[in-house]
C-alpha cells in the first residue's frame, strides 16, 4: 500500500495514475457553449453521452502514466506554482449577467501532471465546446515560467478548477477540484479542511493503492443569479471508469453536493471505496501522544459519526495510532456517515495558521439503497499535520468483477454541523489520562500504586435531565481488560454527564482494545453508542516513572 502526502493550502495531492482515453473518444470532438473562453468545435453532450463514453473507455486498455510536462513546469517549486494566478477577466462565467458564481482553472505544473480537459456546455441546447489551454488565460507573476515553452501547447490542459461565490468572486473560492479525483468545499468560514474523492481503490489491501483521475469536466453555464451549478466528470484509472454528475449548491452557510455516478469495472477490484473522504488527526483530547507543541489539539476532524441502517447512532473518536489500523463497520443500507469537526472553540486549538476550529465537517447521505457492506476507517500514524492520515469510505459487500456496472447516488454536506444528529444524548468529548485513583484525589506524594488508564466521555442533549432521577446506567463492553471505578458525574458547565472509568489490563497483550459504551435508563437506550480503540503499552511500560528531584 502506498500513501501520499498533501501540499497544504491551495493544493491537493498530485495525480499519480494513468492518462485517459478521452483523446481518442474525442478525436473528432467538438463542443459549444456560452463561455467567451471556449474555443473548440460544437458537439452534443449530456449525461447519457458521458455514460456511453465511460462504458466504451472501460473496454479499452488504460493508457498509463501521464506524459512529461514542459521542463519549465515540471521543475516548479510549490511557492512558484502558487504564484500563478488565473486571469479573473477570463473566468468561465464572466459574461453571465448578475452572476453569483464563477469558475477558474488551475495551471498544470509541479506534481500536477495529469492533463484535465475542460468543456463549457449550453444546458438549453446540450451543445458544448472545449476550452483549450493558452498562456494568456493566466498571470505568471514571479513564478519564473518560460512561457515560450507553452506556446502552441493547446492540448496541455489544466490541473483542475475552483469556484467562487459572490460577494467574494475571484477572491475566496468555495469549491475546489484538484489532483486525481480529490475535491473540497467550505462552509461560511471559507476555511478548507478535509477532502473527498471520486473513488478509492485498494486503500487497505496487499496491492498498491490506486488513485483514479478525473480527466475531463463539462460545466453547464450557470443561470443569472443562480447559486447552484452542475458539472460532469469523466473518471479513469487502471481498474475502472466512471461518469459523474455533480449538482453543487453553494448556500450561505454550507455547500451541498448531489453526486450521481455510473461505474464500469475494467478489472477485478479487491476493495472499492464509495464516497471516500480523507482527513487529518494528529492529536486531540483523547490522544495526546503527538501534542508536544503549543497547540492543545491538531486535527481536521475529531470523529467518525455513523447513522446505521437499523437506526443506531455511533460516535467513533479518531486516533493517531503508533501502528496503522483499519476497522470495518458492517451495515445494511446506511442512513449516513461522515468525518466531523464538532469542536469549534478557538481556545481548544490556539492555531492562527491552520484555523482548525473553522474547518468543516463532511456528511454523506445515501440517496439510493446501498445494500450490505462496511464503513471502512483507516488511521495512519503521523508525527504532524502535513500528512492526511485518516481515510473513510463505504465498501459494498459484493466483490467487483471485470465488466461489472453499478451506480450510486449520494449527497455531501460541507458544513459546521451535519444536517442530522442523534435525537438521544450525544458524545461531546472523549478524554484519557492516568487512572488508578479517586477523581479529585490524585496523590501528590507518589503515583498510584497500580497502573490504569482513565477514560472520561461527556454526553450532552437528549433526555438526560429526565432520565437522571430514574437512574442513568452506563453499559460498557470491552474486548479485553476490565473497567473499574465507574462514575457518573454531572458537569454543570456543559449541562451534561461525564461517564468515567479506569481500564485495567488482565493480560500482557498489546493488541488494540475495542471499547463500546452507551447510556441506558430503565432498560432503554438514551444515548448514541460510543466506540473507541485503545492501544495498551507494553507490559514494561505499564508503570509510572517518578522523575521528581526532591533535594
Curated annotation (Swiss-Prot):
InterPro entries: Gal_mutarotase_sf_dom (IPR011013), GH-type_carb-bd (IPR014718), Glucan_biosyn_MdoD (IPR023724), Glucan_biosyn_MdoG/MdoD (IPR014438), Glucan_biosyn_MdoG_C (IPR007444), Ig-like_fold (IPR013783), Ig_E-set (IPR014756), TAT_signal (IPR006311). The keyword Signal applies. The keyword Translocase does not apply. It comes from the Bacteria. Residues 1-32 form the signal peptide. Keywords: Periplasm, Signal. GO terms for cellular component: outer membrane-bounded periplasmic space. It is found in: Periplasm. GO terms for molecular function: carbohydrate binding; catalytic activity. Predicted to be exported by the Tat system. The position of the signal peptide cleavage has not been experimentally proven. Pathway: Glycan metabolism; osmoregulated periplasmic glucan (OPG) biosynthesis. GO terms for biological process: beta-glucan biosynthetic process. Probably involved in the control of the structural glucose backbone of osmoregulated periplasmic glucans (OPGs). Belongs to the OpgD/OpgG family. HAMAP family: MdoD_OpgD. PANTHER family: GLUCANS BIOSYNTHESIS PROTEIN, GLUCANS BIOSYNTHESIS PROTEIN D. This is Glucans biosynthesis protein D. It comes from Escherichia coli O127:H6 (strain E2348/69 / EPEC).
